[in-house]
Amino acid sequence: AMQLIEKNLGKFPVKAVIISHSHVDHFGGIAGVMAKEDKADETLSIEDQLASGKIPVITPVGFTEHSVKENVYAGKGMGRRSNYQYGILLPPGVTGKLAQGIGMGQSTGTVSFMTPSYEITQSGEKLTIDGVELEFQLTPGTEAPAEMNTWLPQYKALWMAENCTGTLHNLYTLRGAEVRDGAAWASYITEAISLYGKDAEVTFQSHNWPHWGNNVVNDYMVNTAAVYKYINDQTLTY
């Protein structure tokens, strides 16, 4: 990913790493972006971390706990089931690859991990990093136990983490990750619409394509929330 950016956009220093949630495909590549010795001192305030020349690692509260629960305590079993769920070990070829709905394949590279130097602990918290304004919305218990959306007001852009992906995502995943709460998931998407829907001109997420235009963004988010709420409500009804 870094090579792709540098090839097409040029080389830029990494000022911070923001990890949206506690799933390995969203934090496991961090060693490709920064070295451990470059991580900012977590005993410093976030302002001092940013001024130190080191790289803050910013996550939602609970990130470390849930990353360890899923990938260490349950890691072996989940890893084996993932091989079946995603077809990771199938050789590429006309009869040998499995698409995943939110992507054409899964990385088979080395997994890395770093603890955060700073945790977002409440919705509405704002940071400015290298001139870019950021506002965070915590969404615990949605697609991941620890997750957050991020609003970039200068760009009218809403990063929906993995809470909206252009598909019906898993409420229960075959690899054995924690079951997701459809009602909470829908509620936090609805909250995002209430907070940012009036101004958002683009929404993007950690899988699949962006959605452009205010009406498109709002329809996309409303429809995604409705899917999870409907499944939750119909399950309780019947």
What is each model feature region?
Residues 5, 9, 37-44, 59, ...:
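A generic secondary-structure signal for well-formed alpha-helical elements
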Residues 2-56:
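Active-site metal-binding motif and surrounding structural segment of the metallo-beta-lactamase
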Residues 23-25, 63, 164, 209:
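Catalytic metal-binding/acid-base residues of hydrolase active sites
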Residues 28-32, 67-73, 79, 169-172, ...:
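Short acidic, glycine/serine/threonine-rich loops at helix termini
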Residues 40-65, 149, 227-235:
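Acidic, His- and aromatic-enriched active-site or binding-groove loops in soluble protein domains
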Residues 1, 51-52, 58, 62-237:
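Metallo-beta-lactamase
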